[in-house]
Amino acid sequence: MHIHLFRCQCMIETIHIKNFRGIRELKLENLGQINIIAGKNNASKSSILEALALFLSAKEGFSLFIKILREILLWRGWYGEKSIYDLFYKNSKELEVSVKFLNQDFANLTLKNSNQSFANKNIAVELKSDKNSWSGRFDSHLIHPDYISSILTSAEATQSNFEFITSLTLIKFGYIESIYSQAYETQVLQDAIRLLREAYPEVKSLSPLQKYNKWIIHV
């Protein structure tokens, strides 16, 4: 499992996780552009990435948060209401993921379980950050048969600033082909810029612009 970050405005410096899955409390500091989490089996490596994925999705709104939460619950193995309950460490009522960015921006994601029953949307979720905040609620009806079939047949292009990749992602219909196409397009663009710079060193990039109802490449 891994996470790709796209178009990030600022690098994550610190992540603080409380009461998430098997993690009572964990703080990772001095993070870099590329971070590798290593450890023994059942050492909560996947839980760290899940917590980060939930936080990053929450930064982009409630809808994406629910989408990523569903993917996390499904790839772990959906076993009903208890799958949601098991997000919380040892019967705790609240879990928290806090992140500080290199530019000193700070954001905090909180999930609260109001009681042992998940009926009537008893899980509250809230994001507080320097730039945007929101709150919402959800219940145990997150995973249904139609959703399970749709997630395996969808190969949508990435619309967010990050991508959470699990074994389920890799077996989605058309996913590998989609990633290959994106990589090929990137390589073609890089090759074109390199060739142009041989003749015109001042060239920085290529951008498509529409002019007189026609698309042209602006250098």
From Swiss-Prot:
Domain of life: Archaea
Stored Gene3D superfamilies: P-loop containing nucleotide triphosphate hydrolases
InterPro entries, A to Z: AAA_GajA/Old/RecF-like (IPR041685), Bact_Antivir_Def_Nuclease (IPR051396), P-loop_NTPase (IPR027417)
One Pfam family this sequence matches: AAA_15
Keywords, ordered alphabetically: Plasmid
Key word Cell membrane present: no
Organism for this UniProt entry: Methanocaldococcus jannaschii (strain ATCC 43067 / DSM 2661 / JAL-1 / JCM 10045 / NBRC 100440)
Keyword Transferase: no
Segments passing through the bilayer: none
Protein name: Uncharacterized protein MJECL10
